[in-house]
Amino acid sequence: MAVQQNKKSRSARDMRRSHDALEANALSVEKSTGEVHLRHHVSPDGFYRGRKVIDKGSDE
């Protein structure tokens, strides 16, 4: 088991953790329908950048 030789200071500990913060997902609003969706993803209605790309019809 690894054991430290010298105690790490609060400053060194906090600087190491500076990259651990979580970020919120970037959301976009579809211009034609107003739906909120993830960036670079198709909206739940099947629209992407104002165009219908997926027909959400019946699955027969």
UniProtKB/Swiss-Prot annotation:
Q: Name one Pfam family in it.
A: Ribosomal_L32p
Q: Can you tell me which family this protein belongs to? A: Belongs to the bacterial ribosomal protein bL32 family.
Extract the coiled-coil ranges from the record: none
Q: Which GO terms describe its cellular component?
A: large ribosomal subunit
Q: Which SUPFAM superfamilies match?
A: Zn-binding ribosomal proteins (SSF57829)
Give the organism the record lists.
Answer: Azotobacter vinelandii (strain DJ / ATCC BAA-1303)
Q: Please name the GO terms that the record assigns under molecular function.
A: structural constituent of ribosome
Q: What is this protein called?
A: Large ribosomal subunit protein bL32
Keywords per UniProt: Ribonucleoprotein, Ribosomal protein
Note the superkingdom of the native organism. Bacteria
